[in-house]
Amino acid sequence: MTADYSFLKSFAEYIIDKLEKGTEVQIILPNNFSCLELKKILTDKYKIKLPIIIPFNSLISKKTDSDYVSKIEELLIISKIITEYKDLQFNKNESLKAAEILRKLINDLIINNIDIKLIEVYNNSNYWQKIYKFLEYCFLRWQEEISLTQKQTKAIHKLKLLQEEIIRIKNKQIILVGMFKPNVFLKRFEEDLKDYIVYYNQTSKQISDGISYYEPNDIYEEAVAIAYICSRNKDKRIAIITNNNKLKRVYCNFLDRYEDLLGNDLRLTNIGELLTSIIKILCNNFDLKLLFLLLKNPLINCSATQKLEVMLSNKNRFISSPKYLLQLQFDNEDTKEYCRNLIDILFTDNPHNILDILTLTKEIAEKLLPTIWEKEGGAELVEFLTNLTAYSKYINSMDKKDFPKIFSFLLSNIKYYKNTDSANIIIAPPEDLALCTFDLIILPHFNNENWTPTAKSHPWLSKKALQILNIDYNETASTLYSDYFNLFLQNKQVIILNAKKYDGKLSVPSNLFLKLQDVIPAVHYVIPAEAGIHLDMDSRRCWNDIRKDDIGDESTAHSHSFPSVLSVTDIETLIRNPYGFYAKKILGLRKKDNIWEEPKISDFGNFIHKVLEEYSKNYDKQFINLNLLDKQNALINIGNHILYGTILPNYTKKTWQIKLTAFSKAFILFDIERRKNCKEIYFETKGELRLNIAGQDIKIIGIADRIEISKSNHITILDYKTGTIPTKKEIELGLSPQLIIESLMLLENGFNIKNENTIVNSVGLGYKARGATPIIIGETTSNDVGKPKSIDYTIAYVKITSTEPYVQTTEIALSIETLNKHKAGLIKLLEYYVTNKSFSYDLNLSKYNDYLHLSR
């Protein structure tokens, strides 16, 4: 049968009976939401004068004129004390996190009137004595620092409020309704009023028959399922139960209107991230990434930001000073003016301490966004800034590079509540809603991590030590969550969700659900696959699952033309990734390296090629007579000179210098050895191969890193590789055709190369050696013209690394017959694309694909 039990309605009947007998009572519930619900029930159904109904926290949260040490000031004081303690070396960030735990421990001891010496002798181990000395030192120093403020702590202030309330309500009947999370104040309240407190915690054994269970594949599919359920139940009052703020943010991305009782981390709001970004800029050396982390904040992002980002992509992304920003070639004055204003606002002043940083942060934020404090969370944030500025003396001398993490941590302690009036969906932790009744309860991510959450062990005190101090509050956690769960099951409809995977780990159902399986023989599904959870959310649709019918028969891109000039790398792209070729060569699209990207392997490869090219081309003029060490130094100096004129991060330059130095000697020895058997060597030589394909003239161009002609007229084309070299199989299949095509260029006289015995004539340039008759490569001119010889070809990949072995050579011999087969295959490939001009989306054999997102 459908459950119709309501905890608060049941209590309302109970209390009406008490009130009718003239009993004066004070009703205390765990939270404000439950109080509002109870008042509504009593007002709507019984039309009576309401008794005093308050949440427990209101007893210790009244506003008074008393001045007390704020939480943020107390954390900074304790953090300073922890950092001072040299036997346990904490950095600033660690000490602040430890301060949160130590603050709670100190307050528990003070409120319970417990002497810390109680635990000094419970364990005589050296480890424990070391911990005890640390805790005692911090406790005594804390007392000294608090006395200097001439204020009481917030905990003592709350205790005084509680004591005043205890005196005021003594001799009245007090009813504690529902389940309360144990804490030091509740414990004190119960002890002092044990003769006056009545506990009401009656529950029903009845369980709804409207319970359903569903396992989405991941947390995003779970969020889609929640949104789908809510969209199908708009006329119902829905509660989504979670105490995980990270998961809540995922769920809320798919919901329009909801009331949020969990609250938002102020650090993660747009306004919080704006201030954090400003502080990162002020506390660090100039960094474009940090600059655009600020500029792309939704509150200040604009078209000028996007234009500036495009200008700073590719090589400009490594500029190391704001002054270089104004040296850019601006397309229009508006962007230039925008850039100039940014520099004036962000980089004019250089604050030296934390107080200056906080003051300047506020000024910069107001210049960038004059209405900043009117935004969501603005009031809370300006109050936080004011307090932190007031107490900055505790951290004023710290290294400013540590401050962004400190600021972010402190900000994460501030909650901001954004609620939507008249929303039928409420998101809250279980303790806030367990006593209330809803049409539909959704229990997402129902596993042991969230139901019941594992209690975190204390970093310094063992469980036994906590029990000796009588401040161990974790014992009742599992019982509490079991009670919450039982109450939720008494609602009309309950849907339990548990994503199969989260953060890459398999999810294990909660033990509470395993108990439920014994109660309900067959859990049915109210979210069948045909309901279309995935299909209703187009933005989450998985393209891999779309059938051809969904997009028609078109799986290719079409063009009206085919390029007449191709590079050897274009040919490889055409083979491995036809759509990438289409996007690059026909649409003219080029991927820009955005400012977030670090220097790539290909950037390092280009640098090494430049170094080796300059060294090799100047070898005969400058380096041939040098000894090994001087040649090595010359190679390194070439690299340093190139890096000096290149815009790169300093750490990248140092890394590349180290790598160049590592393999420099090995390369010099490799070069000397190869030169011994060569009569001619050509470096970075341009070549071309001309073909007529289906009536269209095609020119393929390429640059050979190194071409060697041996004393026996053996020709080797070498390619320097700092990355992965292709396999022999890839070369044989034509998937890595660069050196094959360069060999065809040689075969077809595509390079402008000559020597006394062998002439390789570039047809395009029309070069002819004086006194020599050009011949087709594949034959040799010798003193005995009547005896032509076939020339051998070899292609070689030279792998260069910064670890041993520094230089490795992989050689593959090629015959004229093999080259002719490859040429026939190349012609066939080009004939297909020149004739059809269609490029498949689906074929993608590339290791790196800049156009994959476009093909979708």
From Swiss-Prot:
Stored InterPro entries: P-loop_NTPase, PDDEXK-like_dom_sf, PDDEXK_AddAB-type, Restrct_endonuc-II-like, RPE2
Signal peptide (from-to): none
Residues annotated as transmembrane: none
Gene3D superfamilies recorded: 3.90.320.10
SUPFAM superfamilies linked: P-loop containing nucleoside triphosphate hydrolases, Restriction endonuclease-like
Disulphide-bridged cysteine pairs: none
NCBIfam families in the cross-refs: RPE2
UniProt-recorded name of the protein: Uncharacterized protein RF_0624
Source organism per UniProt: Rickettsia felis (strain ATCC VR-1525 / URRWXCal2) (Rickettsia azadi)
